[in-house]
């Protein structure tokens, strides 16, 4: 069964600017789906439509079985949303904020308190629950926002760049929590600028560029589309041109980089030993070898023509 079904989704802004142009995608229940795209590609606009914050100008979308236009209320009750720039009242304590969110979802006061305490404990904020949010670090605020999005036990969770700007330890903590939620059955729709995050967490990845989906699949299948692994060979001595000629029997030589011979291996990693043997027989001494597998960054560049912009952690 599908948690999210999108067909021909469009959004045109005044002046004829079409930010989203015929997006089709489907997310199965229980999946983690990573949605990637360059700045201005239509990623945020798509998410805003799926979460009922923006009305489509064409096409259709159903989330948790409900139409995002005609059944927007049902959609909102079925989803949790944690935005990159969460509007958390700095004067409220973490506990007060969680309980307020629960009340807004119609949860009785006693149950709101119970759920709030359980969620604060889950995201590691029990000790800080009585402190004002204005004194929280970036990582703590992100965890509080995640807890707020979970207070009504949503079927589908939308996470908008949940770890942007966080230090590696905080980022890993969010990853672990998202994975745990998914194991419990929550469908996760994740936008991220960290390709490693998509590779680690997602069952499937969709890449949007120029308003439309340009690639979709598992991280492994998308990387396999780009090509075979390549071998970076550093030489003690000998001509790189001669080495490339010897290597031609095992794959396609690529342009030299930093004085190293690059070879796309047609037979995969199993050919490495044969390449070394052939170079040795030709009297070419090898100083270093590195087998480099295709990455999601390679996929992103191939499909969009751009590198994704990653912010430094802080």
Report residues per predicted region.
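A short, flexible loop at the N-terminus of ABC-type nucleotide-binding domains that lies
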Residues: 1-6, 10-22, 29, 72
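Conserved ABC transporter NBD signature motif
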Residues: 59-70, 75
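Conserved ABC ATPase "signature" region
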Residues: 99, 103, 110-128
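Conserved catalytic motifs of ABC-family nucleotide-binding domains
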Residues: 153
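Catalytic Walker B motif of ABC-type/P-loop ATPase nucleotide-binding domains
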Residues: 157-160
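ABC transporter nucleotide-binding domain
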Residues: 176-266
């Amino acid at each position: 069964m599908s948690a999210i079904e999108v067909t021909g989704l469009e959004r045109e802004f005044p002046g004829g600017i079409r930010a989203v142009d015929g997006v089709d995608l489907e997310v199965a229940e229980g999946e983690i789906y990573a949605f990637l795209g360059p700045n201005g590609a239509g990623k945020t606009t798509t998410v805003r439509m799926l979460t009922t914050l923006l009305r489509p100008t064409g096409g259709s979308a159903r989330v948790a079985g409900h139409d995002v236009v005609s059944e927007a209320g049902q959609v909102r009750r079925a989803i949790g949303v944690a935005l990159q720039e969460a509007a958390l009242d700095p004067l409220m304590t973490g506990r007060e904020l969680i309980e307020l969110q629960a009340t807004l979802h119609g949860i009785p006061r006693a149950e709101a308190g119970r759920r709030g305490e359980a969620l604060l404990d889950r995201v590691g904020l029990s000790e800080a629950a009585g402190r004002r949010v204005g004194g929280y670090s970036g990582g703590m605020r992100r965890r509080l926002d995640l807890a707020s999005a979970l207070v009504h036990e949503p079927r589908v969770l939308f996470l908008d760049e949940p770890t942007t700007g966080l230090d590696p330890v905080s980022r890993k903590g969010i990853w672990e929590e998202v994975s745990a939620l998914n194991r419990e059955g929550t469908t996760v729709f994740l936008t991220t600028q960290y390709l490693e995050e998509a590779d680690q967490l997602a069952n499937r990845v969709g890449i949007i560029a120029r308003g439309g989906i340009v690639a979709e699949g598992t991280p492994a299948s998308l990387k396999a589309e780009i090509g075979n692994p390549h071998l970076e060979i550093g030489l003690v001595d000998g001509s790189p041109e001669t080495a490339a000629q010897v290597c031609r029997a095992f794959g396609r030589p690529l342009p030299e980089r930093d004085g190293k011979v690059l070879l796309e291996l047609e037979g995969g990693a199993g050919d490495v030993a044969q390449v070394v043997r052939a170079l040795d027989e030709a009297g070419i001494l090898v100083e270093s070898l590195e087998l480099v597998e295709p990455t999601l960054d390679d996929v992103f560049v191939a499909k969009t023509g751009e590198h994704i912009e990653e912010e430094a952690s802080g």
